[in-house]
Amino acid sequence: QEGKINYMPTNDELLEGFQNSRLVNKQTLGIIYMLESKIRDRARHSTALLGMSNYSLEHIMPKKWPNNWPACASEEDRIKRNRKLLTLGNLAIITSSLNSSIRDANWNDKRNGKGNKHGLRHFAAGLETLSDSYLNKDVWDESIIDERAVFLFNKAKDIWNL
């Protein structure tokens, strides 16, 4: 078709997108769900992946991070952190929305829960896109967000032979 452009991004462009593109929730949910559906180790899981509408999108570092997360050293660092909040490395699908008291909690409470409120570890159990290798991190910061973005990028590259 005349005027139709078929363009495949380079690996560098795709990695840039995984690390720095700020996406709307529906886009991110779809991308992470598709990755999960392709990398899921069916031999390890007794349950099937649920339909996409059964998952909630969670900001691992919350949008309201200043309330309970470590402060940034400078205004420039704060701006960089805020830019990372909506990137793929900081977003995850989970089986249920977190309770509001946990959603904006510090990293330890957010991942493990507090009292009778479950955290990410509970609601992400069995999901390869937010595995224990990330939930066991002592901190969740911009470097870990970038690390996870690279992990997701590499999975996408392997799946779609990019």
Task: State the predicted function of each range.
Residues 83-87, 91-162:
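Long, cytosolic, alpha-helical-rich C-terminal regions that act as interaction/scaffolding modules
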